[in-house]
Amino acid sequence: TLRTTKDGPRLYNVPVAETEQLFTSAKQGKELTAAQANELLDEFNDDVLRIKATLKLSHATSAGLNLHGQRLLDYDLNHTTINGTFYSPEELTSMEITADIYIDRTNAEVFIDGGAYSYSMGLKPEAGNTEGFHFWGNNIEVKNLEVFRAQSIWK
């Protein structure tokens, strides 16, 4: 979609609206530490999920979310990058980032800050890594965390 920002028109990538019908809410939390968010995610594995999270960094550092050791989100505030690619939020002084992550068995699609930036990646877990989902970063807050399960097409 094309949106007007303070810097002019900008193209945003968002999933089609019909994807909302495919997912049902499974768990949610607000104002969590990384450890609390990790505990909330413990019951979930790398099956078909949608995870929406807002991370607040305490200072200019990096933070993100791993799945079996693979970085689904690596936000480096010092170098203004996401997974090594330049990204600057609309509000330049913001210490927050929002990610809407769609995960199936082989792929993850990630939509940052409402679609201002998006990427797709293959899932390649580290051999022997069984940690599942894991938020990481120095003194981060997970302001909002929502987990959705996909409905089966076989029902």
Indicate where each model-derived feature is located.
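Beta-rich accessory regions
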Residues: 1-155
